[in-house]
């Protein structure tokens, strides 16, 4: 039984770098000295020695030899040429290395009939230089020598390979009509890479019957011309190509994945036209296509693509369809780049959309044509006009212009912080305070403008004004019941209601304040104005609090400061923008 250690001993104790044999077997805490304390305590100090650790396998050196042995024959396999005992086969594949022999299985359709009898009837006998590699190549050729594999190889359109071979390594350029119709090989590769999705969809949607019908029609109409043309190209450039292999994948999940990717890339419309998100086919109009070659112009490709379209339609109806952005059925169509910006703005601007439609009689209660008034109406008039909820829906709704109110606020602040009759230092101080206030206003006003930009004018603006007047009636009743000195103002700071109790504390009558455009900041000193705008900036955008309690100082009519403990209640509109602010003020005696 080991001794129980104190916390101080546990803290000072450090593990040994390497344990001895006894401590390792007994799972004891060993020490760095030899003999260790455990062995001395048990009188076996003469047997105390370090435990021998097992060496890691990758440090023993056995793995390098085995890996080097396995790599050597693989290098020899790639450099060993292939020879065939059959004369017919030897003429085609004997001088080629293994890499070229592997490419032979993807040869063009015109090369297949020349070597088809030898591939199917005569077995291949390889050179005994490398029996293992020869057996692999023999099995590879025998596995692809069936008629089914030949049909899959024939899926490559013959004109594609011939055109590639003709434009690849031929240095003698002639300006004949046939060569002028041949596209550049660099342009072909670029188009193939950009139109990857089209190739994938063609691979998945093209049936074997459609491919055979295309090849048979092509061979029957242009047999003599194509044979001579392709044979000449094969002699000049024997390099095979398989750029359009259209057989389906063996995995159903992989097929579904590529179909979904095709939906996203082909059937989705970009939000804004740009070279990065525009289809590559729109920029490559003169690329490799069946209509660019004269010897296949008689083929009806539109009729050939009809079964493919039916298959695509069935696939879309039988599986989930994925699309990003706006589809072809959307009202926002960005087919023409010059009109794209205007179309986007029309979608967001309800005024342009509804101007094309017949507005009809509209609301029988509210006549928007006669009630859209831009002239300023004092709050004293509106308070006398809307004394009940029924009055809001019966009488004329007078629109409120917030831009005009902000312009009036800016003019008031410039006059307040102008300081024309002050000294230079005081004038600079006033100007610095004005810049602070204007920066605070500029920080939240763009948010208000963006929220009201998509409104339907004047209907939405009148609706917001009706909501404000409706909320104002409720808060008036609440203030009358509480009998607390209160002031109500818009988000611009314009006072729209003041109780008689508050007027008595400040020395103003309610009519004096409500008969004109009167801002709350006229009752505040300079420091309180800056403090208010800092507070309003936080509640306007970031903090969505409904009530805040602060201390504030107001200036009465005689010019003296009166300290209040105030509570601000913020009423927001449908855009979460402060619409009405109710301030209840209790004087601090």
UniProtKB/Swiss-Prot annotation:
Disulfide-bond pairs as recorded: none
Function: Transcription factor which regulates nonfermentable carbon utilization.
PROSITE patterns, A to Z: PAS, ZN2_CY6_FUNGAL_1, ZN2_CY6_FUNGAL_2
GO cellular component: nucleus
Residues in PAS domain copies: 471-542
Name this protein carries in UniProt: Glucose starvation modulator protein 1
Family: Belongs to the ERT1/acuK family.
Cell location: Nucleus
Main location: nucleus
Ranges annotated as biased composition (Polar residues): 80-90
